[in-house]
């Protein structure tokens, strides 16, 4: 039965295990919600605004079905966009987006209809009636979200995180420090960003010393607002020793507008990653490395819509083990590190790294891997090579608030099914299985990030 009680639960033990975890609170150490939207607490106007307006998963699949861009990110009305989505939605079967949006509809709106061209108008009208009472804060409480960590630039004032402590009840909203723009010396706008950091923190960032001082001040500012983790997007990690004099010369050259060589770009990024690691060591923050996303791969999308518009891909030609060796050994036992990989063929590398370094954790199946298929493969491999018990928990990695409910439910069901299968095969007693799914779903990530 579609989305029935046994949805994704493939054995009797799985049903018992899911009942142990389905109502646990949600802790999410990595997402892309905007704290401003939560604080302002304005209800959405329509179902497209909820499900499609910020979701590049939806955009990509609509493009795959031949929908014109004007019905995705263009000038058409939200209703026209929703009707266009519903018309092709049956083609999404097998992709997790099909299940996530139906879960949102069934669990949050209590509208148990299958999305199609025939039901689109009814769903539009029914959700329109219910949305005025479904504010962001109420939904977070209804989904039992206990803690969420947004992703924030070091230049941020964090004013809405500060306000959240005063006006948001029952949910803790914390920032995450994401200094990618500080490190990406090869990206357009780097100098302007460095100057902005200087203005924000009262430092002369034309010098390396001033820039690092501004970053330290930002780090402290985030700490004062409850931050517990940093986050770094690395296409291919390449972190090694770089002398400070070398980094200083590169910084000054880049700031003056001179073109850098590829070696200089690599050296600067390696130097900065080591600085970020030392900052995190001081505050005992978790360092999250998201590895393997080749961003803005489709030029036409990037030129017209900018980043995060559905033009990113996965690539497997990466030297992860070699690129992380220096960083991991320098911070061996000194820094909690979570490794997320986009290509599933990299899982053996990070799983065996975690097995070798007790302070390293494998992150949740991420982005293109957060389907039932991807999760099952990820969990089974991790259990067989490292410790499933040590998985760094589930992250929504989403810009869409309703994802907290649907994505977490899907993960907990798949986890229960994987562990339940071990019970059915006689590999694990049911008592230990209950403790395992509870730890992975809630206790473990809460202790790792917030303990």
Curated annotation (Swiss-Prot):
It is an enzyme of class 5 (isomerase). Transmembrane segments: none annotated. The keyword Isomerase applies. Pathway: Carbohydrate metabolism; pentose and glucuronate interconversion. It comes from the Bacteria. Its EC number is 5.3.1.12. Keywords: Isomerase. Disulfide bonds: none annotated. InterPro entries: Metal_Hydrolase, Uronate_isomerase. It catalyses: D-glucuronate = D-fructuronate; aldehydo-D-galacturonate = keto-D-tagaturonate. GO terms for molecular function: glucuronate isomerase activity. It holds the Pfam family UxaC. GO terms for biological process: D-galacturonate catabolic process; D-glucuronate catabolic process. PANTHER family: URONATE ISOMERASE (PTHR30068:SF4). Belongs to the metallo-dependent hydrolases superfamily. Uronate isomerase family. NCBIfam families: PRK02925.1. This is Uronate isomerase.
């Amino acid at each position: 039965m579609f989305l029935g009680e046994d949805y994704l639960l493939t054995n009797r033990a799985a049903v018992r295990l899911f009942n142990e975890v389905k109502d646990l609170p949600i802790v999410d150490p990595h997402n892309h919600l905007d704290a401003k939207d939560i604080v302002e607490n304005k209800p959405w106007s329509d179902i497209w605004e909820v499900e499609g307006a910020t979701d590049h998963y939806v955009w990509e699949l609509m493009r795959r079905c031949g929908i014109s861009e004007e019905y995705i990110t263009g000038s058409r009305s939200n209703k026209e966009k929703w009707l266009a989505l519903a018309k092709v939605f049956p083609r999404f079967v097998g992709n997790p987006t099909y299940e996530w949006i139906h879960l949102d509809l069934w669990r949050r709106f209590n509208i148990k209809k299958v999305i199609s061209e025939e039901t689109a108008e009814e769903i539009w009208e029914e959700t329109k009636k219910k949305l005025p009472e479904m504010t962001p804060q109420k939904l977070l409480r209804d989904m039992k979200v206990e803690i969420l960590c947004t992703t924030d630039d070091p230049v941020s004032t964090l004013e809405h995180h500060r306000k959240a402590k005063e006006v948001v009840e029952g949910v803790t909203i914390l920032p995450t420090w994401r200094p990618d723009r500080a490190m990406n010396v090869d990206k357009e706008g780097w100098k302007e960003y460095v100057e902005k950091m200087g203005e924000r923190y009262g430092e002369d960032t034309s010098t390396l010393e001033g820039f690092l001082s501004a970053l330290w001040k930002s780090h402290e500012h985030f700490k004062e607002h409850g931050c517990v983790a940093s986050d770094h997007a690395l296409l291919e990690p390449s972190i090694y020793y770089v002398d400070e004099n070398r980094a200083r010369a590169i910084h000054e050259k880049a700031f003056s507008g001179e073109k850098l060589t590829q070696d200089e770009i690599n050296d600067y990024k390696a130097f900065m990653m080591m600085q970020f690691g030392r900052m995190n060591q001081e505050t005992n923050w978790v360092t999250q490395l998201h590895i393997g996303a080749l961003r803005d791969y489709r030029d036409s999308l990037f030129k017209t819509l900018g980043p995060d518009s559905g033009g990113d891909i996965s690539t497997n030609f990466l030297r992860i083990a070699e690129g992380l060796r220096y960083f991991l050994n320098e911070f061996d036992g000194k820094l909690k590190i979570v490794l997320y990989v986009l290509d599933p063929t990299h899982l053996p590398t990070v799983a065996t790294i975690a097995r070798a370094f007790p302070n390293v954790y494998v992150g949740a199946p991420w982005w293109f891997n957060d389907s039932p298929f991807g999760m099952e493969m990820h969990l089974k491999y991790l259990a067989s090579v490292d410790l499933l018990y040590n998985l760094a928990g589930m992250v929504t990695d989403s810009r869409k608030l309703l994802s907290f409910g649907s994505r977490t439910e899907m993960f907990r069901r798949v986890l229960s099914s994987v562990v339940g299968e071990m019970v059915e095969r006689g590999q694990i007693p049911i008592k230990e299985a209950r403790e395992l799914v509870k730890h992975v779903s809630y206790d473990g990530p809460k202790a790792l990030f917030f303990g």
